[in-house]
C-alpha cells in the first residue's frame, strides 16, 4: 500500500512538472526589437534576444510601491503599438500617463467642483486611490482631438497587451492582458475600476 502511494505521488509530481514545462513552451511572448521596434513571437522558455525587449507574458499589475514614472514595460508595449500604427498610417501618442497622487487629487477635486458630487465626478475622473495613473499603469492617448488613432489602438491594442477599459473614455488604455490575448469587455466608467 505504501509503495502504491509513493508511486501515485511520483506520477502526480512528474505530470505536474511535465505539464508546466509543456505549458511554458507554448505560452507566447512578444519580443520587440529595440532599434526597429518590430515584433517577434517567442515563448517564455526561449525568451527574447539581447537586441530585444519583452512585452511581457501577462497583465502588468501595479507595484506595491508607488512609482514616479510610467511603467517601463507599458512604455515598451506602447512604443511597439505606436510603430505598428505608423505603418498603418495612423498616429498615436500619449497625452497623459503617469500622474502623481497629488495631481490625481487635484484633477478629482476639479471634477467634483465641475459635476457637483464625487459620485458624478467619478464617472469621468477616477478618485486618487482608485486611478491607475498614479501607479504608472494607465495612459490617455490622442485626447481630445484625435479619436481615430485611439480607435486604431482599441482595435489593435490587444496584440500589444493594451486595452481600452471604460465605455465613456475612448482615450484611456491599460495593460490589463498579456499581448495577444483578448481584451475584456468595457466597463461603464471609472467607478467600476478593479482594485
Task: Please describe what each predicted stretch is.
Residues 8-16:
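Bacterial N-terminal signal peptides
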Residues 16-97, 101-195:
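Extracytoplasmic cell-surface/polysaccharide-interacting catalytic and binding patches
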Residues 1-8:
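Bacterial N-terminal signal peptides that target proteins for export
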Amino acid at each position: 500500500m505504501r509503495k502504491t502511494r509513493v508511486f501515485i505521488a511520483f506520477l502526480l509530481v512528474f505530470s505536474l512538472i511535465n505539464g508546466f514545462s509543456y505549458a511554458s513552451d507554448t505560452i507566447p511572448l512578444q519580443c520587440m526589437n529595440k532599434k526597429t521596434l518590430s515584433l517577434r513571437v517567442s515563448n517564455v522558455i526561449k525568451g527574447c534576444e539581447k537586441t530585444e525587449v519583452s512585452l511581457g507574458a501577462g497583465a502588468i499589475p501595479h507595484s506595491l510601491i508607488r512609482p514616479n514614472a510610467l511603467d517601463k514595460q507599458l512604455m515598451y508595449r506602447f512604443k511597439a503599438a505606436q510603430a505598428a500604427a505608423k505603418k498603418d498610417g495612423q498616429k498615436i501618442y500619449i497625452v497623459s500617463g503617469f500622474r502623481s497622487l497629488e495631481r490625481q487629487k487635484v484633477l478629482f477635486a476639479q471634477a467634483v467642483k465641475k459635476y457637483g458630487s464625487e459620485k458624478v465626478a467619478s464617472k469621468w475622473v477616477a478618485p486618487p486611490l482608485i486611478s491607475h495613473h498614479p501607479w504608472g499603469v494607465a495612459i490617455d492617448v490622442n485626447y481630445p482631438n484625435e479619436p481615430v488613432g485611439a480607435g486604431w489602438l482599441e482595435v489593435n491594442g490587444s496584440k500589444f497587451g493594451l486595452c481600452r477599459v471604460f465605455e465613456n473614455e475612448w482615450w484611456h488604455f491599460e495593460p490589463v492582458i498579456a499581448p495577444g490575448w483578448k481584451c475584456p469587455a468595457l466597463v461603464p466608467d471609472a467607478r467600476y475600476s478593479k482594485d
